[in-house]
A protein has these predicted regions:
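A short helix-turn-beta junction within AAA+ P-loop NTPase domains corresponding to the substrate/partner-engaging
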Residues: 244-256
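Conserved H-loop
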Residues: 232-236
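Short, intrinsically disordered, charge-balanced linker/junction segments flanking boundaries
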Residues: 14-18, 251-253, 264
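P-loop NTPase motor domains
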Residues: 1-225, 240, 257-258
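Structural recognition of the conserved hydrophobic beta-strand(s) that form the central parallel beta-sheet
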Residues: 226-231
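Single conserved hydrophobic/aromatic residue that forms the stacking wall/gate
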Residues: 257-267
Length: 267
């Protein structure tokens, strides 16, 4: 599964970055969104460059990691330019209004020490993608998510029940799936997919956060898409989606609750 394979516009880049930020951890101070915003600018710039300028076989997270690794910062030399700086300078000469160039220029407003801290946070957030297993998993795509509503298809996404290291990939997959199918329903099929797509999301609280899920569950049904969230307890949804949890439940057509007896202990 390669999330880059489903990027077709600047809007798709922003959606991918939002999902990445929501389901991974950086090194910024808790409660301070400065680092998150700064990272967002950098990811948007680099992914924009990769999508629009890199060969197809290099459009993946491995290339993003290589870009981050090449971004050396020297606090005592503000005029120093790393390979990525030079790469963007060359692109700016050819395409001064390029989406990636504009985003990178905003990131470069940060001073040397601040830029170094941002890069450290990026490295921490992207650490899972530096594992060989995940590099291979995201090197190319064979899921063809945008075809699920064209014909009857069964796609099983299986995660480990003991290790949640890679669970954020599943939330990323669902986010792209919903966006792709909604756009295809509207642009190709006049508003409704020819084949109903039913997503049975077991352990929904353990796959990471799907951005804007409270709005998605209210709008996807009209496109012949349905979503069934399976939870151990409704409090799990509250812990993950905070104030949006009640809205998510309210936008569901049906709620089934299985009440189990508490374990009785003999004295």
């Amino acid at each position: 599964y390669n999330p880059f394979a489903y990027i077709h516009s600047e809007k798709d880049i922003l959606k991918l970055v939002t999902t990445l930020i929501a389901n991974t951890k950086g090194e910024g101070k808790a409660g301070d969104d400065f680092w998150v915003k700064a990272e967002t600018l950098l990811y948007t710039a680099l992914i924009g460059y990769i999508h629009y300028e890199a060969p197809v076989e290099e459009q993946n997270f491995s290339t993003l990691i290589e870009f981050i690794n090449a971004m050396e910062v020297r606090e005592d030399d503000e005029d120093f330019k790393n390979p990525v700086d030079l790469m963007f300078e060359e692109l700016k000469k050819r395409k001064p209004d390029h989406f990636a160039v504009r985003q990178y220029a905003k990131f470069k407003l940060s001073a040397g020490k601040t830029a170094k801290s941002i890069l450290i946070s990026c490295g921490a957030r992207l650490a899972p993608f530096d594992i060989q297993e995940l590099r291979e998993l995201t090197a190319y795509d064979e899921l063809q998510l945008d075809t699920l509503g064209d014909r009857k298809t069964a796609l099983f996404i299986i995660m480990s029940d003991t290790d949640d290291t890679f669970n954020f990939l599943i939330s990323m997959c669902y986010t792209q799936l919903f966006n792709l199918l909604c756009e295809k329903a509207d642009d190709v099929y006049g508003g409704r997919l020819p084949v109903h797509v039913r997503c049975l999301i077991d352990e929904a609280a353990n796959i990471g956060q799907i951005p804007r899920l409270e709005k998605l569950v209210a709008t996807i049904r009209s496109r012949e898409i349905s979503c069934c969230l399976v939870l151990q307890a409704q409090s799990q949804l509250k812990a993950l989606y905070k104030d949006s949890a009640d809205t998510i439940v309210g936008n569901m057509d049906l709620s089934l609750i299985h009440i189990s007896e508490p374990t009785r202990r003999t004295p």
